[in-house]
Amino acid sequence: MVSSVVKKYAALCMVCLCSSLFFLGLYQFNNKYSQDTIQAANGILALSEEELQKSPVRFLVSGWAFYPDALLTPEEIRDESHYMRYLSIGEQTNFSSPASPSPYGCGTYQMTFFLPERKEVYALEIPEVFSAYNLYLDQDLILQMGEPAQGKPLVQNRMVTFHGGKPVTLTIAVSNYDHFYGGIVYPPAFGTMLAVNTTRGIRFAFCLFGCTVTFVCALLSFYFSRRMKQKNTFLFGLICLAMCGLSSYPVLHMLAAVPVFPWYTIELFCIYLVTWLIIVLQNRICRPGFLPAAISNGVGAAFLVYAFLYGMMASHLSLGAIRFFSASVFCYKAASALYLLIIAVLAIHRGEKRSRPIFYAAAAATCAFIWDRLLPVYEPVIGGWFLEWGSFFIAAAIGYSLWRDVIEGYGNSLIFQEERKQVVRQLSMQTEYSRQVSEAAAENRRLIHDIKHHLHTIDRM
């Protein structure tokens, strides 16, 4: 008994260690903010031939010149005196100062590139910018998403190219009145055209693969849930479908320019729909009791509605409402991770062996939440954030447990069908044998009757 407990908690420690190493590896090697590349300083990025060969693609995080509360053209920046400060992308999600962080308004970002004299084609990938912008190279307007002056939003992941050999000034004038994030939230990627295109292609292929796998899993789950009358399999199909919708957004933003509403509301809804469905399904598998299950399901459903309404009202939110939602998200995610871990532990103590994979996945998801708090400056180059990986681990563990039951049940069903065929075959053979015996008995009775008749006739003679 003691040996079993030691093995169980040794396995738990190993899961926590491996998941922590996994998240630390993501932070170090798959993080736009931890790339060991030269960054801009005071609005200027100077790169040599050797630096471009060493790092053909980099993410422009630091050293942006920023003009708050103004939509400016390059000529206006050069000819007039405007208030300016330097900032790093990701340190805030709004146009204003940290003392008054409102996401609504406008601002202008600028950076000057000093590139090698050799004329090579360079590429600049512009991720989703909230929510409309004009992009200038030197004095020329080369890209417009939405209408910044009129506040009409349009969002898409875009790429522009230009030739080096001379200083190039990049100016991005942004306005936002429709989303709870404002401005350039995610750092743009800059480098040689081949390197930037390769990074985009790998990211697109990864997202497309994730969408395909989750969609196929959803279809298979719906098929087996209908065939075998299993509600848990149907719920897992809904989880896969929600994860497919969530992972399809990078693909959507690469292929099409879309408005903020309703697409980002749907994305926010899918995030918390996955969490709520995981809670519901794990309650059904681990069976913590009626009251804990009812409370957790109700809280998850209420937060899902809250997140949906928050997304619907994204263009009319006060600063207090934004801060309250951020604090609520933190508390909800922490409580969800802790609750899923506790009910998995209790299920294992009750002797439910099929809950063991879910227990280890919940431990990995808890580690994901902890590292998400300890390492907040993280944005993946490829794939999802820490908490998305945690949700994936739990969904995969639940899927493994369910599919194991489905396969076992399907195998038993096939065995039962084969046994039924054997019984039907034996019954038909018995029926045929009984018919033959009955016919033989009837024939014997006829012969006996004829013999008796002949004997009676002989006696009379």
Residue ranges of model-derived segments:
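Juxtamembrane interface at the cytosolic side of transmembrane helices
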Residues: 217-245
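Extended carbohydrate-recognition surfaces in non-catalytic/accessory domains of CAZymes
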Residues: 4-118
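Cytosolic signal-transmission helices at domain junctions
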Residues: 404-442
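Conserved phosphoacceptor histidine of two-component systems
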Residues: 442-456
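Interfacial "cap-and-anchor" motif at the non-cytosolic start of specific transmembrane alpha-helices
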Residues: 2-4, 244-420
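Aromatic-lined ligand-binding clefts that engage carbohydrates, nucleic acids, or primary amines
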Residues: 113-138, 170-172
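First transmembrane helix
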Residues: 22-31, 192, 196-227, 326-348
